């Protein structure tokens, strides 16, 4: 960790706990800051806050009093807290800088950072880069939105390491000096508009990944995405395009049946075991970043010939009752679910539904035309049922939760079918996380066999 005096004796408010808030509070306290932690959950039911309090950190729980901003020089905000929260609005009005925990991580890290963002594919690409860099000169450390707190990793990493960090738009929006050595922008679709307020704001948040990059840094970007290409035209970083439709000699592309990088053969398409056409982009982006950071072709070939995906992302659960079951609980938007459906040629029974963010499912209708049956749950089940009717889906069934949907999916399916959980919605109406929803799916399949 860099020895920095920039936080010493500064009065800092950490707003919202969870894992990132707890880590940020502890890091700042260790760096000599005068820290106040504020969390909505009452202290009696808040073991994280109790722990920090025992460590000598001032804790205020149960409400967000505006007076907490008095005398504060910085607010470190949990990414899940929206910018229309009254205390955040007041902080901005007072001219107090509001950042997220990844900003802290970048300020204290001795290791260079490879940062990955995009509407879809972040976790798969992050996992690929980490695996590809294993055995290279610098040890990869995974961090960020993938579930490992960035500031915890940054304080332990050395200059001999490289931090591979998945960053969301929520996290990027709270950065001002964040500067990765390599940034990847996979794609930009309509997502999280309930949080950002508009697509323009969402795009602006994604663009912050390149805001502080310089010529000696690298921007790996999707040349097939017009919005992403526009970002590439505005950055000072060295552009490294990737494309699955065009030969881009300065970057990564597919030439017939071969994955190429800067004109050099890297791996044959037939050796790549990761399923789905959408994963071609993820492979091209990951191998570009890995090669730029010193990975060998041999290691990349090994990873791509053995890496079949990550949990909750088009994860093959197994075969039960002569049906093939897939867990794609991470698919929290229409584009992800569309990509999942397009990955199969066998008949599909789709399990979908979840939090209603007020959006339409009209864009899902073309993909639903490939689906034999749907089993729908959560707040959006009626909206999705309407979309399925318009798509001409023959069998439309409603369920209460994923657990109930699994049994109903078995009932409406036949031998050889694919039963696919790909919700197209966030989980928060019924489950705390998409992981919890995916685990409920897997456990319910196991329960069918008992």
Swiss-Prot record:
Pathway: Cell wall biogenesis; peptidoglycan biosynthesis. Its EC number is 6.3.2.9. The keyword Cell wall biogenesis/degradation applies. The gene is murD. It comes from Halalkalibacterium halodurans (strain ATCC BAA-125 / DSM 18197 / FERM 7344 / JCM 9153 / C-125). It holds the Pfam family Mur_ligase_M. It catalyses: UDP-N-acetyl-alpha-D-muramoyl-L-alanine + D-glutamate + ATP = UDP-N-acetyl-alpha-D-muramoyl-L-alanyl-D-glutamate + ADP + phosphate + H(+). This is UDP-N-acetylmuramoylalanine--D-glutamate ligase. GO terms for cellular component: cytoplasm. One of its GO terms (biological process) is cell division.
